[in-house]
């Protein structure tokens, strides 16, 4: 493959025709080498950064599948909803009598969750001004004792 220097390229004129001596085999070998180097760099990058979570991943909400409750119609025509849970189906099939079904516990036990409030947002580090308290006070109030005294006088 013929290589030209920058000075030679500047001296060449576009109107002149150049002899084409292009070696396809050498050009393909160069391209194959470049492709192999790119593959090696990609493999090296993925081995170091393949399991990294991207920062934009947290913007999506998780998709939760909610099961629809079953509609059960009685002989009288009343329709009731009962949630479809795996534990409820097993217990209803194991107990044949309604009395046995009433004694067995259905559903998961409730857990007590203690919530700790964020006191930083609730409390204030600055004491309240007396002028603010006076401004919030109701100016025209109803005095029940004064009304009772007025009724006794009449």
Swiss-Prot record:
Residues 48-70 have a biased composition (Basic residues). GO terms for molecular function: eukaryotic initiation factor 4E binding; translation initiation factor activity. Residues 93-108 have a biased composition (Low complexity). The keyword Protein biosynthesis applies. Disulfide bonds: none annotated. Residues 45-137 are annotated as: Disordered. It comes from the Eukaryota. Acts as an inhibitor of cap-dependent translation. Competes with eIF4G1 and EAP1 for binding to eIF4E and interferes with the formation of the eIF4F complex, inhibiting translation and stabilizing mRNA. Belongs to the CAF20 family. This is Cap-associated protein CAF20. It comes from Candida glabrata (strain ATCC 2001 / BCRC 20586 / JCM 3761 / NBRC 0622 / NRRL Y-65 / CBS 138) (Yeast). The lineage of its organism: Eukaryota, Fungi, Dikarya, Ascomycota, Saccharomycotina. The gene is CAF20.
